Amino acid sequence: IIYRVVRLSEEKDMDEFQKGKLYLCATPIGNLEDMPVRAIRLMKEADVIAAEDTRNSIKLINHFQIDTPMTSYHEFNKYDKARALVDRMLKGETVALITDAGTPGISDPGEELVKQCVEADIEVISVPGPAACINALIISGLSTRRFCFEAFLPSDKKERNEVLNELAAETRTMIIYEAPHRLVKTLTELMNILGQDRKIAVCKELTKKHETVFRTVISEAVDYYLSLIHI
């Protein structure tokens, strides 16, 4: 009986040892000098790199002379592709996950892969580095003691209004992503629920040559970006 228990324990350990791992590798959000050294090494050692957009990531891969095969992993294939990647890790392969820019798993498809790895008892390891939301927060001049991250507001009108109504009572610093062509619309909506005098910092081109941070109140931000449209 003792032999059988030990034997089963050894087999279990062997199964655990044979599993691969998932590395969440942060990449630059604009400046290639911000690429984590550890991420470069792990991406080179991995069996495959799962990239949100292989066409975009190939520039990064080539710059750092990484020859690991890439596979696409994005919003429209995340469920099936996550299962396929989990199967590979269960067979002992190591996967490095990267996003278009910054830290994977934050408001991107990486969340689903992490979830499936956890369910399959596969080790998930973070390789820290740039993250646009945190970079914006720490240079904003707004309170960093308590904050919430909203990512992109919903595009569906009903869902968007529900979220905006929830934010109306939010007193913490809010981090919100927005595309340039929708900035004025979103700022106007926020002004209507938060008031004209709510402090704001609009951060653009973070870590790049033309990085800008516009610190003001919402009403002035709306007026300023409207004036740029009419130039």
Features from the language model and the residues they span:
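Glycine-rich, flexible N-terminal cofactor/catalytic loop recognition
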Residues: 13-76
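Anionic-ligand binding region
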Residues: 160-164, 186-227
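Class I SAM-dependent methyltransferase SAM-binding "motif I" and its flanking Rossmann-like core
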Residues: 112-170
